[in-house]
């Protein structure tokens, strides 16, 4: 079973600025209400193989690992727990003078359906909060 949530929105900020916010994962708690903490487990630029410990309200700490990264455009990371793997995708596409952000959260495994039933509403709310945090922060940067 696979469950996926996806959200996209236009942002009145250059794609480069939006990208810099997306990959600065340790800054997310200052921008996004649905993140309590993000701690990188390695140093240097975000890259395939980078890992972070993420804490979100009402969820257990999770260890995320970057599985794909296309500089300036997208990155994906995954976390796994018994019976379920969760993948988060972050895509920035230029749109005129601004950008479009697309966020996805995909869960698969034997417990994916149960997670969708129990946590689907919270997942969608957190995804919306994440999008709003990125949009608000990107649009508030003087430029």
PLM segments and residue spans:
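A short, structured loop/turn motif at beta-sheet edges
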Residues: 12-16, 43, 67-72, 91-100
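A generic structural motif
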Residues: 59-61, 71-72
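Short beta-strand segments that buttress and anchor functional surface loops
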Residues: 50-57, 75-81
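Short, surface-exposed coil-to-beta transition loops
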Residues: 4-6, 60-64, 84-89
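Beta-strand/loop substructures that line and gate deep hydrophobic ligand-binding cavities in soluble
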Residues: 78-129, 134-136
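Generic structural detector for well-ordered beta-strands
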Residues: 8-12, 39, 53-55, 65, ...
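Hydrophobic ligand-binding cavity/cleft-lining segments
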Residues: 1-43, 133, 139-143
């Amino acid at each position: 079973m696979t469950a996926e949530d996806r959200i996209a929105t236009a942002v009145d900020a250059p794609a480069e600025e939006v990208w810099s916010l997306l990959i600065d994962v340790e800054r997310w708690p200052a921008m996004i209400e649905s993140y309590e903490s993000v701690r990188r487990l390695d140093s240097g630029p975000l890259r395939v193989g980078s890992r972070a410990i993420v804490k979100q309200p009402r969820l257990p700490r999770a260890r995320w690992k970057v599985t794909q990264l296309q500089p300036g455009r997208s990155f994906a990371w995954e976390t796994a727990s018994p019976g379920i793997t969760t993948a988060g995708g972050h895509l920035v596409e230029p749109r005129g003078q601004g950008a479009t952000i697309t966020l996805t959260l995909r869960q698969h495994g034997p417990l994916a359906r149960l997670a969708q039933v129990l946590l689907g509403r919270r997942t969608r709310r957190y995804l919306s909060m994440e999008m709003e945090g990125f949009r608000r922060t990107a649009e508030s940067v003087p430029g």
